[in-house]
Design a protein with these regions (language model features):
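Catalytic Walker B motif of ABC-type/P-loop ATPase nucleotide-binding domains
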Residues: 121-124
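Conserved ABC transporter NBD signature motif
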Residues: 23-31, 38-39
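Helix-to-loop junction immediately C-terminal to a conserved catalytic motif
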Residues: 15
């Protein structure tokens, strides 16, 4: 949908960041209002404006996020290594996040969204502002993730919808105006 259509708001509702003004939302059978902790265990979220700690090192940040999800010790080390490999952060893992390009920051955001191995990924404009090479890499990663997880993404780029999506939902002023398979 267009700017202001309600895409980001809907994503914030699904991820339990804000409550709906009316209606209900369930994620894998869990109500976002009544069972928000269960929903949060199952959802990974990459917001449009990726809130990263710029003074932290990549590996340090992923360890911090793992701790938030109660992943510690060897399990945390294993997940961090898996996320670094999956997102192509190997050469950047010892750098401060503030020193990374936008493309690598997006990769850090994806890694943090997946650190707890959620079954649902919610990505709000995950390729906005990326250069052509970064765009290809991130789209490939999202496509691969879609083979094993449910991925909900918002975008204004129709080529991205065609490249990444099986289904499209168009929202305008908070109302679904189209909902169909591609």
């Amino acid at each position: 949908g267009p700017n202001g259509a309600g895409k980001s708001t809907l994503m914030k509702i699904i991820t339990c960041f804000i409550p709906p003004t009316k209606g209900t939302v369930n994620v894998e059978g869990y109500d976002i209002w009544e069972q928000s902790m269960e929903v949060r265990k199952r959802v990974g979220y990459l917001p449009e404006h990726n809130p990263l700690y710029l003074d932290m090192y990549v590996k340090e940040y992923l360890g911090f996020v793992a701790g938030i999800h109660h992943i510690t010790g060897q399990e945390a080390s294993k997940r961090i290594d898996e996320m670094i490999e999956m997102t192509g952060l190997g050469v950047e893992m010892h750098k401060k996040i503030g020193a990374l390009s936008k493309g690598y920051r997006q990769r850090v955001g994806l890694a943090q969204a997946m650190i707890h191995n959620p079954s649902v990924l919610i990505l709000d404009e995950p390729t906005s502002g990326l250069d052509p090479n970064q765009l290809i890499d991130i789209r490939g990663l999202i496509r691969d993730l879609g083979n094993e997880k449910s991925v909900l993404l918002s975008t204004h780029i129709m080529q991205e919808v065609e490249a990444l999506c099986d289904k499209v939902i168009i929202i305008n002023k908070g109302v679904v105006v189209a909902n169909d398979n591609i």
